[in-house]
Amino acid sequence: MTKEELINEIKNMTVGELAELVKALEDEFGVSAAAPVMAAVPGVAGVSPAQQEEEKTDFKVVLKGFGDKKIGVIKVVREITNLGLKEAKDLVEKAGTPDAVIKEGVPKEEAEEIKKKLEEAGAEVELK
């Protein structure tokens, strides 16, 4: 398989398939796809971890559970993420795992809004 063929195959993958591929590559090569963390952030020296947490601007919305409201949660996940039915169902079924990220890098207001919608549908959600 040429490099171009591999790239085309990756382009045709769904979000769920890409997440599985990344996980498999991490396991196979013992690496992490997470962005490297900076050792020191200019301008925050001497700030306690609690204060840094308060100043956080980008959030990750993580699905922790869905109780007995799976269908309602799937509908809301589809609305928020624009995923297809199968991809949204697969994502909801990953609830409680590190792969159950509904959306990441969102501002606090949007993250709170997403959390509220999901909780109204019966989901248990965490903002990170």
UniProtKB/Swiss-Prot annotation:
Transmembrane feature ranges: none
Record carries keyword Ribonucleoprotein: yes
Gene Ontology BP annotations: translation
Gene3D superfamilies per UniProt: 3.30.1390.10, Single helix bin
UniProt keyword Membrane, yes or no: no
Cellular component terms per the entry's GO annotation: cytosolic large ribosomal subunit
GO molecular function: mRNA binding; structural constituent of ribosome
UniProt xrefs under CDD domains: Ribosomal_L7_L12 (cd00387)
Superkingdom field: Bacteria
Alphabetic keyword roster: Ribonucleoprotein, Ribosomal protein
Complexes and interactors: Homodimer. Part of the ribosomal stalk of the 50S ribosomal subunit. Forms a multimeric L10(L12)X complex, where L10 forms an elongated spine to which 2 to 4 L12 dimers bind in a sequential fashion. Binds GTP-bound translation factors.
Protein purpose: Forms part of the ribosomal stalk which helps the ribosome interact with GTP-bound translation factors. Is thus essential for accurate translation.
PANTHER family: 39S RIBOSOMAL PROTEIN L12 (PTHR45987), LARGE RIBOSOMAL SUBUNIT PROTEIN BL12M (PTHR45987:SF4)
Family label: Belongs to the bacterial ribosomal protein bL12 family.
Protein name: Large ribosomal subunit protein bL12
